[in-house]
């Protein structure tokens, strides 16, 4: 009997210890966790030029990865990459698997689940990869019945151009690869997506001109973090984004990622919106 009571007591003690340990971990802020472990954990997901993994070495590269290295250096900790997907990044943050997911747009829906610094990480614009021979300065120049524009079905560019260009023929593809193939084959006159992705596709097909029609449709991206009372990491990320943006390092790592794919960066709009004239 005494032995049974002792076993019950020990079981309760272990359960209580586990409960309070988990509670303590839950209460530990991102900043505290980084300092205690000496690690900054960033989510990484395939998607150039933000992140890409070298199949030969297994090493990650891209603007998101390299800015992650800068953050870890300024924190005085080790950078740890945690592979995830764009769709699972929010859940990975909420469950404490990662400390931040860089290059995640601060949409209103995402803001309900996670936090974002006020300072944008960088900017991109809705661009157009247009075939040679078509002069375009403004979006209105594309609002013609004789112009076929390829877009990815259901994407932001699709939704925006459906309203902005009612006269143009929008040709919708299930993914960008099919749109690029159609552009290369001459089945569409232009492709519209955000300009960093178009820069990579232009380098692949070796055709067309990449432009940002006016008025420029701009979108900021950021770094998602957990919602928490302790705002230390939030404020750190806010200050770092501002510093790296103004110093030119953000643009440097963007260009570096494009150069790895043979892109002539002198012909590509930057991710610094003040450069867009």
Language-model region placement:
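A ligand-binding cleft/hinge motif common to bilobed small-molecule-binding domains
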Residues: 88-91, 104-113, 160-163, 184, ...
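Short helix-initiation/N-cap motifs at beta->coil->alpha
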Residues: 80-91, 136-137, 171-185, 219
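A structural signal for short loop-to-beta-strand junctions that line the ligand-binding cleft
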Residues: 31, 62-64, 111-122, 210-214, ...
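Extracytoplasmic small-molecule ligand-binding "clamshell" domains
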Residues: 24-104, 112
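Periplasmic-binding protein-like
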Residues: 122-130, 195, 199-241, 260-277
């Amino acid at each position: 009997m005494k032995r049974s009571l002792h076993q019950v007591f020990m079981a309760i003690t272990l359960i209580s210890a586990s409960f309070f340990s988990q509670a303590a971990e839950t209460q530990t802020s991102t900043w505290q966790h980084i300092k205690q472990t000496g690690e900054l954990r960033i989510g990484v997901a395939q998607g150039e030029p933000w992140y890409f993994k070298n199949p030969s070495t297994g090493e990650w590269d891209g603007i998101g990865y390299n800015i992650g290295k800068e953050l870890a250096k300024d924190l005085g900790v080790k950078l740890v990459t945690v592979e995830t997907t764009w769709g699972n990044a929010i859940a990975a943050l909420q469950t404490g698997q990662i400390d931040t997911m860089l290059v995640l747009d601060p949409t209103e829906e995402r803001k309900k689940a996670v936090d974002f610094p006020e300072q944008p990480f960088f900017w991109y614009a809705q661009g157009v990869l247009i075939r040679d021979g078509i002069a375009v300065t403004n979006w209105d120049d594309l609002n013609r019945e004789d112009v076929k524009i390829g877009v990815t079905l259901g994407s932001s560019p699709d939704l925006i151009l459906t309203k902005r260009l009612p006269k143009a023929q929008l040709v919708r593809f299930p993914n960008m690869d099919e749109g690029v193939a159609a552009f290369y084959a001459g089945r569409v006159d232009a492709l519209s997506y955000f300009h960093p992705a178009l820069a990579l596709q232009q380098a692949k097909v070796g055709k067309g001109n990449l432009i940002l029609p006016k008025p420029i449709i701009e979108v900021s991206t950021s770094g998602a973090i957990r919602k928490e009372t302790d705002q230390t990491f939030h404020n750190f990320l806010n200050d770092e984004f501002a510093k790296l943006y103004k110093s030119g390092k953000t643009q440097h790592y963007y260009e570096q990622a494009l150069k790895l794919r043979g892109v002539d960066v002198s012909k590509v709009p930057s991710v610094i919106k003040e450069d867009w004239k």
